[in-house]
UniProtKB/Swiss-Prot annotation:
It catalyses: N2 + 8 reduced [2Fe-2S]-[ferredoxin] + 16 ATP + 16 H2O = H2 + 8 oxidized [2Fe-2S]-[ferredoxin] + 2 NH4(+) + 16 ADP + 16 phosphate + 6 H(+). InterPro entries: ChlB/BchB/BchZ (IPR050152), Nase/OxRdtase_comp1 (IPR000510), Nase_comp1_CS (IPR000318), Nase_Mo-Fe_CF_bsu (IPR005976), Nase_Mo-Fe_CF_bsu_N (IPR024564). This molybdenum-iron protein is part of the nitrogenase complex that catalyzes the key enzymatic reactions in nitrogen fixation. Coiled coil: none annotated. The lineage of its organism: Bacteria, Bacillati, Cyanobacteriota, Cyanophyceae, Oscillatoriophycideae. Belongs to the NifD/NifK/NifE/NifN family. Its cofactor is [8Fe-7S] cluster. This is Nitrogenase molybdenum-iron protein beta chain. The keyword Nucleotide-binding applies. NCBIfam families: nifK. CDD domains: Nitrogenase_MoFe_beta (cd01974). Pfam families: DUF3364, Oxidored_nitro.
């Protein structure tokens, strides 16, 4: 018997027991699986240039996408505001996916509700589901704001959110003064960063509805973007504090996604107050830290509010320098001394380690802004990006990435692959191998197949704990990036040199 009360096996050992091995073998026979030799033959063929050409010729199929659905980003934008309950107009299964996708990365509960659309609603429309859902949500959870987004089902049948919300208010199921921003977030176009942008724009337009810029409040607005490193949220707030600024971080997710365990459950955490968000229309300017996550929001702020927006990417030393100098120029305040010290530490760390990473060939994938930040840092360290892949790419991103790479001697061998997926990346790694790969947890399958060392940076990271608590921006973030990359390469070097009397001549204690 595989399991007994005196010897409980976990899943790592359990499925290697004879009973399960026999079950798996019977399953293969039942399904008529090809022989192991045939499987190996085809697997070897998929590593070839011939297969790569066929792989890159496909048009109507995505295999292992490096992006997520729009509502996921909408949820992340919404939970950063005080007392806000995300409401997804669609099926329960979709909402469960979004919640677990965030929870598995942050290791924190993420609250969201659904209108629970089923087959009937798909045929006759989801009005009743939304009205009932809003009534129950407000009665049970007492939110200060309900942020509504949609799934594919609601979008395919063309449900009119504005009209539905009007009916709900007319029926008296939610108060007239309850803010209910809504965003259409169809997952068959765009990605999670599109959903973030749509929801952020909707929240700001709803909270400032009917207002006009009257006078400056002396504040600076900050938008982090689709930010999955809570250390970065803290870094932004630390910069605001160090400059002694009156600043408003629009969608402050720090306490929601990294809350202390004090023995009492809180459904809502601090976040950006609705009053501060409503007053953001009167700020001096808005600073965004991601270009391709907030295009509609920035356009809205510039055109509707008549407010200037500035975009910075504080990755690596140069990017952080530009951000701090830009902030100093914008506010008229000097750069605090503490950042000079932090910069010196980053430069010192980079000097200590550059010999171990200089000239290393890398592959990288992720969201456009994440990849641009990583490229900035890699080029500073003399790392040579070879494969740059962004599934949710844009023409503007590709032009910017190519210009950045062309301007550096270390970017001359790089190719930017826009709109490609992780099965494309697999072909690239087999046909043009690199020294390491930077990506999220889904890259572990690429690591297993191609034996390319993986440095986990991005979202989601499901199979390692607490990386989201670190920063990737600022001078401290540069040290973290250097730490992960350099030590990952050294771990791989140890693995390659650990055979006594064969490879261990380079199994060094000091590196």
């Amino acid at each position: 018997m595989a399991q007994n009360v005196n010897n409980i096996k976990d899943h790592v050992d359990l499925f290697h027991q004879p009973e399960y091995q026999e079950l798996f073998e019977n399953k293969k026979q039942f399904e008529g699986m090809p022989t192991a030799e045939k499987v190996q033959e085809v697997a070897e063929w998929t590593k070839s240039w011939e297969y790569r050409e066929k792989n890159f010729a496909r048009e109507a199929l995505t295999v292992n996408p490096a992006k997520a659905c729009q509502p996921l980003g909408a949820l992340l934008a919404a939970i950063g505001f005080e007392g806000t309950l995300p409401f997804v107009h669609g099926s329960q299964g979709c909402v469960a996916y979004f919640r677990t996708h965030l929870t598995r990365h942050f290791k924190e509960p993420v609250s969201a509700v659904s209108s629970s659309m089923t087959e009937n609603a798909a045929v006759f429309g989801g009005l009743k589901n939304m009205v009932d859902g809003l009534q129950n949500s407000y009665a049970l959870y007492k939110p200060k704001m309900i942020a509504v987004c949609t799934t594919c089902m609601a979008e395919v049948i063309g449900d009119d959110l504005g009209a539905f919300l009007g009916n709900a208010r007319q029926d008296g199921v939610i108060p007239d003064d309850l803010p209910v921003p809504f965003a259409h977030t169809p997952s068959f176009v765009g990605s999670h960063i599109t959903g973030y942008d749509s929801m952020m724009k909707s929240i700001l337009s709803t909270l400032t509805e009917g207002k006009k810029k009257e006078t400056t409040n002396g504040k600076i607005n900050f938008i982090a973007g689709f930010e999955t490193y809570i250390g970065n949220v803290r870094a932004i707030k630390n910069i605001i504090s160090a400059f002694d600024l009156e600043g408003t971080l629009l969608s402050d997710t720090e306490m929601y996604l990294d809350s202390p365990n004090l023995g009492e459950f809180k459904m809502y955490h601090e976040g950006t107050s609705l009053e501060d968000a409503a007053d953001s229309i009167n700020a001096e300017a808005t600073v965004t830290l991601q270009t391709y996550t907030t295009p509609k929001t920035r356009e809205y702020i510039e055109k509707k509010w008549g407010q200037k927006t500035y975009t910075y990417r504080p990755w690596g030393v140069k990017g952080t320098d530009e951000f701090l100098m830009g902030l100093s120029e914008l506010t008229g305040k000097p750069i605090p001394k503490e950042f000079e010290i932090a910069r010196g530490r980053a430069v010192d760390a980079m000097t200590d380690t550059q010999a171990w990473v200089h000239g290393k060939r890398a592959a990288v994938y992720g969201d456009p802004d994440l990849v641009m930040g990583l490229l900035q840092f890699m080029l500073e360290m003399g790392i040579e990006p070879v494969h740059v892949l962004v599934n949710n790419s844009t023409k503007e991103f590709e032009e910017e990435a190519k210009a950045l790479l062309a301007a550096s001697p270390y970017g001359q061998q790089a190719t930017v692959w826009g709109g490609k997926d992780l099965w494309h990346m697999r072909s690239l790694l087999f046909t043009e191998p690199v020294d390491f790969l930077v990506g999220n947890s889904y890259a572990k399958y690429l690591q297993r197949d191609t034996k390319t060392p993986l440095i986990r940076i991005g979202y989601p990271i499901f199979d390692r704990h607490h990386l989201h608590r670190y920063s990737t921006i600022g001078y401290e973030g540069a040290i973290n990036l250097l730490n992960w990359i350099a030590n990952g390469l050294m771990d791989e070097l140890d693995r390659k040199t650990d055979t006594p009397s064969v490879t261990d001549i380079s199994f060094d204690l000091v590196r």
